[in-house]
Each structure stands twice: as structure tokens, then as C-alpha cells.
Amino acid sequence: MKFYIRTFGCQMNINESEIMAGLLKEEGFEWTENPKEADIILINSCAVREKAENKMYGAIGGYGKLKDENKNLILGVGGCSAEKERENLLERFKNIDFVFGTRNVVDIGNLVKRALNGKRFADFSDKLNDVNYDIPKMPISKHHAWITIIYGCNKYCSYCIVPYTRGFEKSRPMEDIIREVESYAKKGYKEITFLGQNVDSYGKDFGDKKSKLDLLIQKAAEFDSIKRIWFLTSYPSDITDSLIQTVANEEKAANYFHLPAQSGSNKILKAMNRKYTREEFIELVNKVKKEVANVTVSSDFITGFPSETDEDFEETVDLIKQCRFERINIAEYSPREGTIAYKYQNDDVPKHIKNKRLQYLMELQKRINLEENEKYLEQEVVIIQEGKAGKNGTYMGRTMNNKLIIFESNEELNGEFLKVKVNKITPGPLYGEVVNNLY
């Protein structure tokens, strides 16, 4: 029997889909990239914004048509939307055979077998204690591994559904993570990314309430074949001086931080239940840029959060101008049922104002990007080739500080270190030509 997995959302979802695929292959199922060939279709959903949920609903409808043609087709839905909607999905969509949660992904083999027996069900049991380093996976990349080190989030930002769909923070044992890093190192992997909804909270639940992400990075760096270590996603006020120094001093730690600000207004940050002020955030960015050589910093912002005035928005604009991020992700505020903001804060900023502010920030960031990218012109940079950038024979890779470079190459060099000379800059990627193969 063949299976197909459709993944929406974040890197953690991608990692969990890799795990589900690996477990199903171990059970004797065969993976297919064509849903029309599949006997089992799994949807790994996202609930961060309404748009992501709508994509899931569209997928359910589309695969439901396949089920009309193949009555034996099994359709399962997991991920954050499944955790949020639970049994309602079974009631609303009669073509769904089973629904499962975010903390029992490792039980997917048993869940599929139950579904094959013909009974519809929902299962949201917690199986995180069963997660370990040797769980089978089907990695997308042959050189870059994604490793989830902490599950859940305790922050309860007023707009965010994640604490309700992912649960409380739970860190994996450090020795288990290191054994997983070792397994990838033995396979020749060059890059790893440590994942978590709040990755710099790793280890705080071990007893002393101190983050141990810095120590984890140091231990992972001991493996010779591992050349780059990344981590996503950070919570600004949880970034420690020790972590900054580890990134500054450990040559294998990527000199890149993703620090979601969400707003530049103290009034809005308080309404969002973010645990820092604009002044503290700017101070953190300045500290990172001072301590870590050639570092880049990216961020996230929400436009049109309830009660956001023009003055609040101008404070966000000013923060972006001061911090000069390498990249920003921007989203219009999307009310999420079940969150504090949905219950207690009126969605009072008109849609067209949300979009106008989003477009303004995008144009501002483009100008900043172009100015910041000028220093790379005619410079030689080291990248790892990731794969194709398009259909015209171009490939892409990233520098140690997360600059995206596009160049002509060939598939045989995927996963290899290359030196590329930058000959064109844009507000987005840089363009160049390969100088030589380094390894």
C-alpha cells in the first residue's frame, strides 16, 4: 500500500512529516509523491493563521474527491488545526477517517492500522515520551537535518493558538538529541537545525529553569562532519548572554538569529502579552550585532493587531529602521478562535488598513535589504548548495549568515561547499558565479 503526506506550516511540521514517512516505510508502506496513487493520505495541518487553515480545508475537499473514486482510500488529518478542531473535523467532513494530534505523531503506524480496520476515530494521546533518536525518518535533504529539541510553548501570546495546539513545553533529553546528531554525522550530514516553537527555552523544564541551548550547540559542534548549526525559533527575552557568546565563539554555529518582534509599540506588545519592551528588543539586537561578527538578524511582525493606531504603527516602522533586519516576515492580524485576543480584544483595525501597513513594511524592508546587500557585491562567499532555484538551471545556497545566493551549477554539487562570487544584488537573493568547490 502507498501513502502520501501533504504538509502545511512550519519547519516542525516538515520534520514531523519526515518522521511519519519514516515510520510508515518501516511498517511496510510505500511512499508516493502522487496523491492519486495513494491508498493512505495524511494531511499535516497548520493553524497559525486563517489562510493556513483554509488551505487544509481545501485539501480535505480535494482528497475527498479522490475518495469518491476510491472507497478504500484512507484520509487522516493531523497537526495544529486537527488539535484545535478535534472531533469537529470528523463531524464536518465525513470523508475523513481519523484525526490525530501534535503529540502522538510517533504513533502514526498504529493509527493508520486502526483506520484500515474501518472505524473512524480521533486520537489525541500524548506520546512524546516515545520520541527518541533512532525513530525512522525519511529526510527531505541529504545534507541538512531538522531536529526538534523542544515541544510546545508556555508564553501564551494573546494572538497565538500554538500553546493550545502544541501544549506545554517539553524538552527532549540532551543525550538523546546528541545521539540523533551523531547518527546524522555518521551519514555525512553537514548541517543541522535545532527546532522548537520556543527553541531557546530548551532545558528550562529540567529543573534549574536555565536554557541549555548553548550547551547543546557546543556538544553538537564536536562532531567533525557537522559544519553548520542553526536554531529556530527564538523568543527575544529568552536569549541569554551565554547563547550569544556561544554563537560568537563557536565557528560551527551559524551567525544568524531569528528574533520575532511582532510590534514596535509598547502598548501593542503589552496587549500581545509579549514579555519585553521595544527598548529591550532594540538593546538585544544591538548586543547581538556587537558581539557576533558578520551576523544577520531576521524578525516577524503583525500589522493591524487590535487597537493598533497610526502612532503604534509608526513605532514599528521606527524599530525596523533602527534594527535593519536581514529579512522580515509580515502577516496581517488573523483572529484565532480560542486565543486571548479572540476572546477579549475587538478586531477593530479594518482589513484595508492592515494590508496598507503590511505593504508599507514590505517596501521599507526592500529598501533596507538593497542597502545592506551592497556590501556583498563582488565579494566571494562560501555557501552549501541546497538544490534547484528554478527551472532555468540555477541553483541556490546559503552563507553562514543566511544570505541566499543563486548561481548556475549542477545537481551533483547538492550538499557541497562552494565559493561563489557575487555579481548581482537585489532586495531578495544575491546572484553570483561559482569560483570553486571547497571540499
Curated annotation (Swiss-Prot):
<dbReference type="InterPro" id="IPR013848">
    <property type="entry name" value="Methylthiotransferase_N"/>
</dbReference>
<keyword id="KW-0479">Metal-binding</keyword>
<dbReference type="InterPro" id="IPR005839">
    <property type="entry name" value="Methylthiotransferase"/>
</dbReference>
<feature type="binding site">
    <location>
        <position position="46"/>
    </location>
    <ligand>
        <name>[4Fe-4S] cluster 1</name>
    </ligand>
</feature>
<keyword id="KW-0949">S-adenosyl-L-methionine</keyword>
<protein>
    <recommendedName>
        <fullName>tRNA-2-methylthio-N(6)-dimethylallyladenosine synthase</fullName>
        <ecNumber>2.8.4.3</ecNumber>
    </recommendedName>
</protein>
<comment type="subunit">
    <text>Monomer.</text>
</comment>
<feature type="domain" description="Radical SAM core">
    <location>
        <begin position="139"/>
        <end position="371"/>
    </location>
</feature>
<dbReference type="Pfam" id="PF04055">
    <property type="entry name" value="Radical_SAM"/>
</dbReference>
<feature type="binding site">
    <location>
        <position position="153"/>
    </location>
    <ligand>
        <name>[4Fe-4S] cluster 2</name>
    </ligand>
</feature>
<comment type="function">
    <text>Catalyzes the methylthiolation of N6-(dimethylallyl)adenosine (i(6)A), leading to the formation of 2-methylthio-N6-(dimethylallyl)adenosine (ms(2)i(6)A) at position 37 in tRNAs that read codons beginning with uridine.</text>
</comment>
<dbReference type="Pfam" id="PF01938">
    <property type="entry name" value="TRAM"/>
</dbReference>
<dbReference type="InterPro" id="IPR006463">
    <property type="entry name" value="MiaB_methiolase"/>
</dbReference>
<dbReference type="Pfam" id="PF00919">
    <property type="entry name" value="UPF0004"/>
</dbReference>
<dbReference type="GO" id="GO:0035597">
    <property type="term" value="F:N6-isopentenyladenosine methylthiotransferase activity"/>
</dbReference>
<feature type="binding site">
    <location>
        <position position="10"/>
    </location>
    <ligand>
        <name>[4Fe-4S] cluster 1</name>
    </ligand>
</feature>
<keyword id="KW-0819">tRNA processing</keyword>
<dbReference type="GO" id="GO:0051539">
    <property type="term" value="F:4 iron, 4 sulfur cluster binding"/>
</dbReference>
<dbReference type="InterPro" id="IPR002792">
    <property type="entry name" value="TRAM_dom"/>
</dbReference>
<comment type="similarity">
    <text>Belongs to the methylthiotransferase family. MiaB subfamily.</text>
</comment>
<dbReference type="GO" id="GO:0046872">
    <property type="term" value="F:metal ion binding"/>
</dbReference>
<feature type="binding site">
    <location>
        <position position="157"/>
    </location>
    <ligand>
        <name>[4Fe-4S] cluster 2</name>
    </ligand>
</feature>
<keyword id="KW-0963">Cytoplasm</keyword>
<dbReference type="InterPro" id="IPR020612">
    <property type="entry name" value="Methylthiotransferase_CS"/>
</dbReference>
<keyword id="KW-0004">4Fe-4S</keyword>
<feature type="binding site">
    <location>
        <position position="80"/>
    </location>
    <ligand>
        <name>[4Fe-4S] cluster 1</name>
    </ligand>
</feature>
<dbReference type="GO" id="GO:0005829">
    <property type="term" value="C:cytosol"/>
</dbReference>
<dbReference type="InterPro" id="IPR023404">
    <property type="entry name" value="rSAM_horseshoe"/>
</dbReference>
<feature type="domain" description="TRAM">
    <location>
        <begin position="369"/>
        <end position="436"/>
    </location>
</feature>
<dbReference type="InterPro" id="IPR007197">
    <property type="entry name" value="rSAM"/>
</dbReference>
<dbReference type="InterPro" id="IPR038135">
    <property type="entry name" value="Methylthiotransferase_N_sf"/>
</dbReference>
<keyword id="KW-0408">Iron</keyword>
<dbReference type="InterPro" id="IPR006638">
    <property type="entry name" value="Elp3/MiaA/NifB-like_rSAM"/>
</dbReference>
<keyword id="KW-0808">Transferase</keyword>
<keyword id="KW-0411">Iron-sulfur</keyword>
<feature type="domain" description="MTTase N-terminal">
    <location>
        <begin position="1"/>
        <end position="117"/>
    </location>
</feature>
<feature type="binding site">
    <location>
        <position position="160"/>
    </location>
    <ligand>
        <name>[4Fe-4S] cluster 2</name>
    </ligand>
</feature>
